[in-house]
């Protein structure tokens, strides 16, 4: 979707959040994102992650060599990828996207700091990352790509016209998370199905697995909460993640958050 979205817009940055590098050849990733960067200069971001990001079956299907377990060589893959975007292979003349390292563990912060890359912490996977973000800042090594540490945070956030309506439509995400923690990966359920599930489980509508958080509420409440999370991490950018069953409600959620932060453009300006 990066190409079509970039083609349909002219101002916003578009990117991956992210490419799970262990599933792919670094050269192939470099080729794909170099082409996108050549087509849309200065607008393409490449977020790189290490997690499987999918079920065991799909991870196996993506495996580079199914005859043996995939090696744990993520750092070597990152070095190779950055080499293509850095000195690179002269004959290929790669265009470079902006590369960030995504993570939810202390090790990801170590790598981001060592490589001198922007760091995006997945609070929606593993809350409690401010200490990890602080480690990244303290140990950051300036690079050609980045002279100072830069932290972003990705967080669950869901806005609706009222606090109660936001809480209601968040039931789909809560059912998915509870099912995932029990080892079941399910499609996004309807709000009605999710509410019935929570009722059957005798779980409050605002229930979540221990340690997880979903920001819900009116646009103003969500804005205040997102600003608080950004301050907690010292983040200059916030990635909003949500799971909503109805596509129109999901779009409205993003519109409400954008309006709360006054991110909307005038009718005459391009996106």
Language-model-derived ranges and their functions:
Residues 16-23, 215-216:
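The substrate-binding groove and active-site-proximal loops of carbohydrate-active enzymes
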């Amino acid at each position: 979707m990066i190409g079509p979205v970039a083609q349909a817009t002219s101002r916003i940055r578009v990117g991956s959040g992210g490419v799970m590098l262990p599933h792919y050849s670094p050269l192939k990733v470099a080729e794909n994102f170099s082409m996108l960067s050549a087509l849309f200069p200065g607008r393409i971001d490449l977020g790189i992650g290490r997690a499987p990001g999918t079920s065991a079956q799909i991870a196996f299907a993506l495996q580079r060599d199914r005859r043996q377990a995939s090696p744990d060589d993520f750092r070597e893959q990152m070095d190779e990828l950055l080499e293509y975007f850095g000195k690179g292979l002269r004959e290929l003349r790669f265009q470079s996207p902006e590369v960030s390292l995504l993570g939810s563990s202390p090790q990801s912060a170590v790598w981001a700091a060592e490589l001198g890359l922007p760091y995006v912490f997945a609070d929606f996977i593993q809350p409690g990352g401010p200490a990890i973000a602080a480690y990244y800042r303290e140990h950051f090594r300036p690079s050609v790509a980045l002279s100072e540490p830069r932290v972003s945070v990705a967080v669950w956030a869901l806005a609706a016209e009222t606090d109660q309506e936001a809480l209601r439509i968040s039931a789909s995400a809560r059912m998915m998370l509870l099912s995932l923690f029990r080892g079941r990966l399910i499609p996004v359920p309807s709000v009605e199905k999710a509410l019935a599930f929570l009722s059957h489980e005798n779980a409050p509508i605002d229930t979540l697995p221990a340690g997880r958080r979903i920001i819900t509420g009116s646009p103003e409440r969500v804005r205040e909460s997102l600003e608080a999370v950004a301050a907690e991490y010292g983040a200059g950018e916030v990635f909003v993640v949500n799971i909503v069953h109805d596509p129109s409600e999901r779009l409205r959620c993003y519109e409400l958050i954008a309006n709360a932060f006054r991110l909307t453009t005038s009718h005459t300006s391009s996106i």
